[in-house]
Amino acid sequence: MTFDPASALAEIKARDAYRWRRIVESPQDTRVVIDGAPRVNFCSNDYLGLANHPAVREAFRRGVDRWGVGSGASHLVCGHSAAHHALEEELAEFTGRPRALLFSTGYMANLGVVSALAGRGDTVFEDRLNHASLLDGGLLSGARFRRYRHADARALEAALAESRAETRLVVTDGVFSMDGDLAPLPELARVARDGRAWLMVDDAHGLGVLGAEGRGTLEHFGLGAPEVPVLVGTLGKALGTFGAFVAGSESLIDYLIQRARTYVYTTALPPAVAEATRVSLRLVREEPERRERLRCNVRRFRAGAASLGFGLGDLPGPIQPLVIGANADALEASRRLGERGFLVSAIRPPTVQAGTARLRITLSAAHSNEQIDGLLEALADAVPQEA
């Protein structure tokens, strides 16, 4: 039978799982105009408020004046500019690694790195709640693919003990994007070491946010390159720009340049984006008060949510999901918040497990106390108290 997209769409809509795009008509900020209506934005990943920072915007403009818009080719042809190279060196220094390598997106970084490091005859071990890009990398690598219970180092240890593969790659998020919890990295690092496995961490939601200097989840736990030899980070969240990178040893990066297909066979990022990111990285390092303000905002929101009876886990970062349950109920809560002037997305399967649809609330250093208090007041009216 020929595939019928219309029938498939009807089935998605019947499950309240249909997703649609909304049109943003303003820069990313705590206040945005979306579909023609002003909203206070509590669903962006712009954790430090850098996406619309004047210095970052100015660096982008200067980059366009210096480099033009497009890079013109892949990094290995003629698209690797001095701006790209300088950013890679600065990211390597920031993460405490000998080298770093830019990728066009976080999805491409994860897909490329996992599939380059593991293949037929190897085994990839992944947390069940890893980001889709990590899971897809494992599935498409050709390696045997095993998923262990979420944040369960003992389950990973048992899986490694059963493996006879010569090459073993353990892959985890640092901060889980839909749940906001941290991977137990010290335990995972010990298990990976004892199990003769590489450990790869995607710190998309930890970089810039966690740790005294914003170096991410590894800094938060006091870990470094010996424990986590493969580190992936994104530029499109706390750093406020676009793209991603992997940081590691000289030999790792040189190998990925040769073998990571999502690096080799795609056009390089616009050099102006690299110039803007160099400035945002400098701001991350020179303005620790942004992280402190974010922590204060997270504490304020969590205290208010607890006083309203909402159950939140032990989540130290800006991702504070409120699990609703049914798809229709999450959509209705999001709609009610919109009526009160707040933008909070309803996250539904397949992004999260069935029966755990949620409001994914994200805090920014740029949010004011008044905006946070207003959201809490709106949540009290929009969300059932048993959530």
UniProtKB/Swiss-Prot annotation:
Pathway connected to this protein: Cofactor biosynthesis; biotin biosynthesis
Q: Which Pfam families match?
A: Aminotran_1_2
Residue numbers carrying N6-(pyridoxal phosphate)lysine = K237
Checking CDD domains in the record gives:
KBL_like
Where, by residue number, does pyridoxal 5'-phosphate bind?
A: G106, Y107, S177, H205, T234
Q: Which cysteines are joined by disulfide bonds?
A: none
EC number(s) reported in the record: 2.3.1.47
A GO MF label: pyridoxal phosphate binding
Catalyzed reaction equations:
6-carboxyhexanoyl-[ACP] + L-alanine + H(+) = (8S)-8-amino-7-oxononanoate + holo-[ACP] + CO2
Cite the entry's keywords alphabetically. Answer: Biotin biosynthesis, Pyridoxal phosphate, Transferase
Which superkingdom does the taxonomy of this entry point to? Bacteria
Cofactors, names only? pyridoxal 5'-phosphate
**Primary enzyme class:** transferase
Q: Which residues bind substrate?
A: R19, H131, T351
* Family matches, as Gene3D superfamilies: Aspartate Aminotransferase, domain 1 (3.90.1150.10), Type I PLP-dependent aspartate aminotransferase-like (Major domain) (3.40.640.10)
Q: Which GO terms describe its biological process?
A: biotin biosynthetic process
The record's note on quaternary structure and interaction partners says:
Homodimer.
Q: Which HAMAP family match?
A: BioF_aminotrans_2
Instruction: Write out the similarity annotation.
Output: Belongs to the class-II pyridoxal-phosphate-dependent aminotransferase family. BioF subfamily.
Function description: Catalyzes the decarboxylative condensation of pimeloyl-[acyl-carrier protein] and L-alanine to produce 8-amino-7-oxononanoate (AON), [acyl-carrier protein], and carbon dioxide.
The protein's name in its UniProt record? 8-amino-7-oxononanoate synthase
This protein's species is Methylococcus capsulatus (strain ATCC 33009 / NCIMB 11132 / Bath)
The protein's gene is named: bioF
